[in-house]
Amino acid sequence: MWFFNYSWGKIFEFIFFPFRHLNPWWGMIFISLLTGLFMLAVFKYTSNQKGISQVKNKIKAHLLEIRLFKDNFALSLKAQGNILRYNLKYISYSFKPMLVMIIPLILILIQLNLWFGYHSLEPGQKAIVKVKLKKEYNPLDLKLKIDPSPGFRVDSPPLRIEEEKEVNWRIQAKKKGIYSLVIKVDNQSYQKNVAISQNSLTKISPAKVNKNFWAELLYPGEQPLSSDSPLESIEITYSSKKMNLFGLHLHWLIVYFVLSIIFGFGLKGFLKVQI
């Protein structure tokens, strides 16, 4: 799984490389444009384009029929029934491209969350490091500590939560850069990246997880912990990022879907795609 995550992640690093020092909106606009083109290509080559065109024309004709015969209840009712029938047919034509798109879109969304979902820490800012243990381990029985780092300082002793199989520390960022947070468990060391005051568009991994298909799928930003590790995950509580639109703070997912749909509908005529 890591080989796929690493390779897939490199594609997004290449895409966003020119936008690292720019406002995140530029990177969002570009990836939304690419997504819109991808959706159009899928529709063009996997759907019944002729059938979609015919169905849309039928729906338009029956809508016009309702307007022309609005005083004739029977004809209007029949036209509405036909509109419903052709809408269902249109949905059936759209099902195949939607099925083709769903998995790639999920994989894209997971990667985009690394780029648009979190703020890096700022010097002086505090965050919580959460270490989750596997269920067979007790946090009271293990010796855990965080090694010193030039980029941050450990601001609290470990808080061991036996019921949650969890150990927490508070850290404070000191110096900008990407640093390795090294957690020692007995005689073993485990590393997690910490991002401090990075570029406006930066890949930030909130969690490093143990080898597990679903966990690795959802948190693909770092190589997973070894399967024999007592740790289930290492997490840093970065603050969530919003897209600023004239003072309105929007979740990146909303912006991404809206822009992708706008680009898709805006380019469908130019590319001669029926959707």
Question: What are the language-model segments listed below?
Answer:
Residues 89-118:
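Transmembrane alpha-helices and immediately adjacent membrane-cytoplasm interface residues
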Residues 44-54, 258-275:
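Juxtamembrane interface at the cytosolic side of transmembrane helices
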Residues 165-167, 174-181:
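Short tyrosine-centred short linear motifs in exposed loops/low-complexity segments
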Residues 1-39:
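Long, highly hydrophobic alpha-helical transmembrane signal-anchor segments
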